[in-house]
Amino acid sequence: MSDKDDLRKYSSQVIDGVEAAPARAMLRAVGFTDADFDKPQIGIASTWAMVTPCNMHIDKLALEAEKGANAAGAKGVIFNTITISDGIANGTEGMKYSLVSREVIADSIEVVTGCEGFDGLVTIGGCDKNMPGCLIGMARLNRPSIFVYGGTIQPGAGHTDIISVFEAVGQHARGDISEIQVKQIEEVAIPGPGSCGGMYTANTMASAIEALGMSLPGSSSQDAIGGDKASDSFRAGQQVMELLKLDLKPRDIMTRKAFENAIRVVIALAGSTNAVLHLLAMANAVDVELTLDDFVELGKISPVVADLRPSGKYMMSELVAIGGIQPLMKRMLDAGMLHGDVLTVTGQTLAENLAGVPDYPVGQDVIRPFDQPIKKDSHLVILRGNLSPNGAVAKITGKEGLRFEGTARVYHGEEGALAGILNGEVQPGEVIVIRYEGPKGGPGMREMLSPTSAVMGKGLGKEVALITDGRFSGGSHGFVVGHITPEAFEGGPIALVENGDRIIIDAQTRQITVDVSDAVLAERKTRWVRPESKYKRGVLAKYAKTVSSASEGAVTDKYL
């Protein structure tokens, strides 16, 4: 067997020998030559679609990755998986499909690669669920693989982005701006291709994946348009051939230490609460034990230093302009915050990758020094108490305060809550409770971006809190707590809260409680009846039957 045959572990089973003549005939029709049958096959999973600006350019990046694979002596084969648009679906029934799409992306990458016999993979993602979906798919297959991020969008006119539009809706409801002004913001906020422009979920997860070692250095911090992203895609296609030669696979890279690095980088960047959910799910895919407690312990020793939206003032494109996250990671490594001995897709360790990285330019204030942090410990606060015995996730930078106490205003679902905020039913001093939005109860664990944006737009950001068994967009800010477990559909305490109950959220003690006795909660539980799901067939019904708790990453293969 030749060295090249050693690199064809999977494709050789599909196309070698006289018995495989039908398979070769099919491949000749899509462009294979005699010479191509002797090459390793690199699958290139593209999430291209015209349903969202996050992904509208990824077809071109897939072609670059194919060129890179071919230039390195492999044969690149492009295939597509799906994407949805959180920005379009938020606030609607369609958002129930968002988290489901993470599983569909992972499943489809596994299905196509397993069927076709690709020897290695490049996956390219743009919108939020693409990133964890691609990583979970690659992790399950455990073949030499690299992730490429589609890149960030440019700011809209007046330093606007998609969150500017969501919050304009609330400003209009308050009477601060006219419908014409809302339309003016709407028309300029999204100027072209790329993922949403703050440290929202897409940029958070791309940064986490780079810190994890599963993308090439710099991939998370490049504009969607321009030469850097095309080059990143080409080099990824080339590098998979090197990973094949090294036999370096996702499980060699996605180790416990690598996940700790990813968590600490997410914290430094003030990243999205969705990172908790997705990192738990990605760890599950490689059998790395990761729990909410790990976020607690690492959070105690990890400062927030990035002044990025939604909590800060800068956009991702401004971080790109000063060097991206590589200088931050170099600072963190030098300060002993990262494990430098972990392997990455370069074939080198993280420390080796960062050895020659220059620091940020003098005078920039996007990334602060560690001795002048925005917050000395994590903004991702894991809360427990009689309202969430299995844990909840809050994003608290300190600007919102560290404690909130108020009376419950309860809604069964997002739509009622949004209406209550916009029509003035929600009053200062209240805790908005949105329940039956968990992974099973929604189903799909919708993001509460429309309600949180309405809260901010109505000027209630410091006057109310919002808690839910659903999730939040990376663009949400304010005093918000999500991922409450057990969820309402499972009979968790959030299902037992009544209007007027006193709720206390304390980030310093990491507690979330309802001021109701155990006896009263027990009595309410006897009267509680699980609502019947309206989904009896199809993907949402299947998802609700198989999905795990949010505290376990909301995965669908944990208890099979």
Predicted features along the sequence, with ranges:
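Glycine-rich, highly charged phosphate/nucleotide-binding loops
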Residues: 98-107
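A short, small-residue-rich loop immediately preceding and capping a beta-strand
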Residues: 113-134, 146-149
